[in-house]
Amino acid sequence: GVGNDELATVGGKLAQVVKIMGENVTLQIFAGTEGLSTDSEVVFHGEPPKLRVSDNLAGRFFNAYGEPLEGGEIIEGEAREIGGPTVNPFRRIQPSELIATGIAGIDLNNTIVTGQKIPFFADPDQPYNAVMANVALRAKADKIILGGMGLTNDDFLYFKSVFENAGALDRIVSFVNTTENPPVERLLVPDMALTAAEYFAVDKGEKVLVLLTDMTLYADALAIVSNRMDQIPSKDSMPGSLYSDLAKIYEKAVQLPNGGSITIIAVTTLSGGDITHAIPDNTGYITEGQLFLRNDSDTGKVIVDPFAVASETARHRQEDPRGPSAGDERLRAPLRRRGQRQDQAGERLRPLGLRRAHPEVRLRLLGETAGH
């Protein structure tokens, strides 16, 4: 019989089973139904999307189906079903190892540990993809897995040229959906990226950093499918399953006993800076901490703002019609002063992330902190 998530070909176009009701099967055609006749032939493939995994994935760029973009050789290896279950909690261990990104606003103020899942909130006009490329080049990880959704052609070429020029392709695997590709294909990209990550982390015991951009476009693709299936939309026209769909991705982050790990940093663009929109709102409940990208009014540069959460809370409190109390002001003033003095960022170092840092680095940083 036909199974859920099984691939099919409808009139020469690739599709996937999204619902089975008795003898009726609903298919999502990735490239859309334009040009298809009502009597188009349907051929079921008998299996869901799969990715062939091997060490030869490194240095390659793939599309949403796991096919090489540069026209190189097809990867030979075990074909693994994408979108599988997360690691059994019994097999997980407490994350405690620092994963350095090379960006001070992250490493000093929002230290990331292996196995963590953290969103990167940014406005659509900010250079978040450049930041992701920077993290990919500087991060102290064995493998970097990039999942690009809705990338412009310029962004795709930018990632490719940066990785090639830096000579870092041997540790980077990229899965890319561009604006020229069908939007629904974006739904496959995170699962492809995470299947590759699981191979290197679980099978090879490597430290893997997964970079996903842009999760807002991923959620928009979910909404497209939901609308086509006549499902009742939830908040902000998003599907009611948004939380579960996002959690399925983020919960792949894990620290394993064999030393392997999957750490996820995912860009979520904000519409008009609205942090209360359904996408960032649900993301905040699933993930551990947040990173914010903003324009610094003093320097004119784009920075990673470690104090955006505190300042956002303060702003909402000030807008409260009851007005801020004296106690609130006493609590808020030190935060405001701290946010204005980026050179004191070391005070917010996370001891958890420093446990396995180089001894000299740890002593120097903790010594600076103690000196304030």
Map each language-model feature to its residues.
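Acidic-enriched and Gly/Ser
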Residues: 1-101
